[in-house]
Amino acid sequence: MSDNIRVGLIGYGYASKTFHAPLIAGTPGQELAVISSSDETKVKADWPTVTVVSEPKHLFNDPNIDLIVIPTPNDTHFPLAKAALEAGKHVVVDKPFTVTLSQARELDALAKSLGRVLSVFHNRRWDSDFLTLKGLLAEGVLGEVAYFESHFDRFRPQVRDRWREQGGPGSGIWYDLAPHLLDQAITLFGLPVSMTVDLAQLRPGAQSTDYFHAILSYPQRRVILHGTMLAAAESARYIVHGSRGSYVKYGLDPQEERLKNGERLPQEDWGYDMRDGVLTRVEGEERVEETLLTVPGNYPAYYAAIRDALNGDGENPVPASQAIQVMELIELGIESAKHRATLCLA
């Protein structure tokens, strides 16, 4: 594509407003051209030059739209992505990819048969702390990792009236927060041999999962993934123990908060995390503890890679095949919790 990639965005809820619209608009070589929304006033307040249409079908039928982005309620991902692909569009779907594994596999097969790029927005691969940790492991600083613990905890004791907290398909934090942690674990360590998962509704009036605790078992490693909506005290984001040392990091990547506050890209200081981690290494008989600077996060890298993939200059940053692995663990985790059992991957 020699001209700008023209992007159509479906919906203008939290994910579109906070992540996708500013990241798309801030990527050279891409144009946020059309947004499908029932609230034109809300869209125009942020993006006065963007065309607003009332229904997604107008994006599917627009021959000038190259890429359709779908950050809508989880149970709509499959039908919208399928319709967009069948209309000949390239597609980005927010996480979780779909509600079921079979839906994810069907979309992947459809995209391949049509020669379309299908990508899933697992943006937390570009978190500041995750990039720091990924670098540590690549350099072998911690040695062989035996224990990895990752938390995504919040304090929201009141159940809110929104689709993510209602009891419909794809609701709850096992579908909302856990995909981030599962994707990061797979990126670092690959698929586990087995997993043991506890899912619960702990808040009064909860209609969907608001607590999860997952143990991913590898031959010589345990990965603990934890999320709750009832954590007033701060938990460590990462606790990692290896044969040569440990890494502990508190705090959450700052990019979402900055985007939520309306900051636009590009910015020279983008992604800087002011909270550093602690690296502990054993040298001989001595234990050495040092502050480890956190590298900048880089959410803009996702849409830059999408641009390059559509132009034939690079790889899809998160192909559907990788998101399918996350869906495998989501479904296996639900079965594990249902049967209160450790289950092996097929």
UniProtKB/Swiss-Prot annotation:
What the entry lists under Gene3D superfamilies is as follows: Dihydrodipicolinate Reductase, domain 2, NAD(P)-binding Rossmann-like Domain
GO MF annotation: an example? nucleotide binding
| The species this protein was found in | Escherichia coli (strain K12)
Entry keyword annotation includes Transferase: no
Q: Which residues form a coiled coil?
A: none
Q: Identify the SUPFAM superfamilies for this entry.
A: NAD(P)-binding Rossmann-fold domains
Q: Which family does it belong to?
A: Belongs to the Gfo/Idh/MocA family.
Q: What is its EC number?
A: 1.-.-.-
Q: Which GO terms describe its biological process?
A: antibiotic biosynthetic process
Enzyme superclass (EC): oxidoreductase
- Tell me any Pfam family this protein matches: GFO_IDH_MocA_C
Q: Which gene encodes it?
A: ydgJ
GO CC terms on record?
Answer: cytosol
Q: Which InterPro entries match?
A: Gfo/Idh/MocA-like_OxRdtase_C, Gfo/Idh/MocA-like_OxRdtase_N, Gfo/Idh/MocA_oxidoreduct, NAD(P)-bd_dom_sf
Query: What is the protein name for this chain?
Result: Uncharacterized oxidoreductase YdgJ
Keywords tagged on the record: Oxidoreductase
